[in-house]
């Protein structure tokens, strides 16, 4: 029997992920900074994408925890006193970077899409 966070992860993350049509990322255009105006433009693009998907009968599910913990790992943010979780965040950063390469620092959204 699984309990606590493992059970929640299986139900909320893995189960949903296996049933979705695909995953996607949205990144700031090359050369754009993380200034508010750039982030707002990118947010507008994300909103248009999300609304278009909804019109097509598709659902979009954000997956922002991965981005948050990858950022914590990259920046060395001490979000907890638990050394295991700090190592996990650093590993999360490494895995994200392995998946998307040099685009990792520009990512602003990760999601899944499906019916």
Positions of the model-derived regions?
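Acidic, surface-exposed loops and disordered segments
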Residues: 1-115
């Amino acid at each position: 029997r699984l309990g606590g966070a493992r059970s929640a992860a299986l139900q909320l993350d893995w189960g949903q992920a296996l049933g979705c049509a695909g995953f996607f990322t949205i990144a700031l255009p090359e050369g754009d900074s993380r200034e508010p105006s750039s982030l707002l433009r990118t947010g507008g693009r994300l909103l248009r994408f999300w609304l278009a998907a909804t019109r097509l009968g598709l659902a979009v599910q954000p997956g922002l925890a991965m981005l948050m913990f990858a950022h914590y790992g990259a920046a060395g943010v001490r979000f907890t006193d638990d050394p295991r979780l700090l190592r996990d965040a650093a590993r999360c950063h490494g895995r994200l970077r392995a998946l998307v390469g040099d685009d990792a620092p520009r990512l602003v959204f990760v999601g899944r899409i499906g019916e």
